[in-house]
Amino acid sequence: MKFINRYSAIALAVGLLTLNMNAQAETVSLNTNTASQTSAEIQVLQQGQWDNFNKQHLDAMITKAKQSPAHSYYAVFDFDNTTAFLDIEEAVMIYQLEHLLFAMTPQELKSVIFKDIPAADFSADFNNKDGKPVNIDKVGADILESYQWLYDNYDGLKGDKPLSEIKKSPHYQNFITKMRYLYAAIGGTFDHAVSYPWVTYLFMNMTPEQVAGITAKTIEWQKSEPVEGVVWESPASLPGQAGVVETDWHNGFRLVPEMQDLYQVLQKSGIDVYVISASNLEVIKSIVTQAPYSVPESQVFAMHLLRTKDNKLTSDLDPVYPQTQGKGKTETIRKFIQNKYAGKGPLLVAGDSEGDQNMMSDFPDTEVVLIINRLRSPDTIIGQLSKQAVKEHGQKDAKVLLQGRNDSTGVFVPSQLHTPLGAKEGRALK
């Protein structure tokens, strides 16, 4: 397989970022290399790498809420790129692909990868290496041809060859590259209502426990991976109908200690914590219901697949639950959460993307909106909220907080600035 590192990785603060899934109950410890605060100042959260104003504002919010009876208020968090650095669903997909962790026959895989995908050509950004357009019919045929070979030969499916031998075949390279390419092409071409659920269907025929196991192994693997851009290219020896294609992603998923601390402090202060994620429910539950997050399972909402009678996941979303992205996050709060708190909206909403902007702006009584800065477009609601945060920074009555991050290291930075992967300088707004 052709692997290309597009950017140099800056491997800083690894000890700060890593979390051993086998020792999650340990107390989170953050670096506090900041000037000492006077006794008159509120100290609730550990300093870590928070922007100082953001920390002080969150401290004040928590201290005020503690004056009310426990469970009077609640906070809602996104997971991917908010609670964590990068996207756990995407990281799990890479691990699943590289280890061929599938429980589907070729015919079942066909039903999954074609599910709800329009026949139109993908965006020109996803043309093949010859500049020609690609669509689901073309790349789907190539994926299924290679998966059939893998299914017949790999001893983890129906064959008798070990993975080490399977990896030498161009079918392995072709399958994993074109699957990851398809995921990117769907997301970059079609509506989020199509693209977000699609990747969750790859768990078809697995139990929740199997998904949780894959997730734990993914986190363990990723915590020692460099933070960098990676590119895969499909083998020229198997162009198929789609031709040779390329796909890239941001490697180095990390759990963020500042957010772990925030979860803990909120709950210890009597503020209930909810997680609403566009990733698969079993993936998210396996992380946030454990220490140090310790969120009750009933307070976790994500893409909720129906199960069979023997508790295996299907490729159908449970219609009882809204799609947990965009307006669906607001719908989830209104349908399952708000009435438990006398109709109040969340005290705090934390997110990073357009998928979070509705729940950030739909509840007038929300006191604080925390945005993890990823330089969102000014044409979006979250882009406008980010602009508001820059304007309000330092003001006592600020509602929106913008927290900076360096995407070359995976850590928060003590400012509002976002530094993209490979960039040398950060900025507050796009």
Language model regions located:
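Non-catalytic pre-domain segments flanking phosphatase-related domains
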Residues: 3, 7, 14-16, 23-79, ...
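Glycine-rich nucleotide phosphate-binding loop and flanking beta-alpha elements
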Residues: 83, 91, 377-378
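Conserved phosphoryl-transfer catalytic core
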Residues: 93-184
